[in-house]
């Protein structure tokens, strides 16, 4: 961590909607000087809202889907690592989130996975019972 705070990379699913959890996890990591995210809806958008509410610098890294097609996601993940995060805060997500966590670990960046009750119960995924 730099003297003036952490550089935190946030990743997670586009359908992740637990604003309170995102805010609580980021609040617990103080001091934060920058939040790096992929500029997608879901976890990324919630992290950006946190930045605005706390007056913390955001570093959005949007994927260039139109230009690069399927390669855009992994390219965006590499670009986010280029911001030299101190840690990755990973909320539940899919392949893109898994790719980001894998790349971060290979780069020696600490990854903190934020579990949900559904994930802890083994019900994460498309065939999960929505009543849980």
Features from the language model and the residues they span:
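Acidic/glycine-enriched connector segments
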Residues: 2-8, 15-127
């Amino acid at each position: 961590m730099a003297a003036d705070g952490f550089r935190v990379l946030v990743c997670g699913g586009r359908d992740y909607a637990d604003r309170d959890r995102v805010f609580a996890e980021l609040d617990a990591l103080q001091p934060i000087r920058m939040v790096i995210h992929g500029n997608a809806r879901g976890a990324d958008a919630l992290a950006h809202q946190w930045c605005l509410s706390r007056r913390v610098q955001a570093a959005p890294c949007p994927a260039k889907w139109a230009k690069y097609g399927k390669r855009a996601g992994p390219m965006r993940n590499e670009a986010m690592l280029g911001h030299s995060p101190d840690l990755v805060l990973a909320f539940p997500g899919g392949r893109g989130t898994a790719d980001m966590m894998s790349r971060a670990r290979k780069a020696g960046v600490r990854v903190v996975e934020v579990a949900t009750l559904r994930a802890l119960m083994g019900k994460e995924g498309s065939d999960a019972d929505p009543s849980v």
